[in-house]
């Protein structure tokens, strides 16, 4: 998901 990419940071 898009949020997943951000949370990975």
From Swiss-Prot:
The keyword Secreted applies. The modification Leucine amide is found at residue 9. Keywords: Amidation, Neuropeptide, Secreted. It comes from the Eukaryota. Its main location: secreted. The keyword Transmembrane helix does not apply. GO terms for cellular component: extracellular region. GO terms for biological process: neuropeptide signaling pathway. It is found in: Secreted. FMRFamides and FMRFamide-like peptides are neuropeptides. Belongs to the FARP (FMRF amide related peptide) family. This is Extended FMRFamide-8. It comes from Namaquaphasma ookiepense (Gladiator bug).
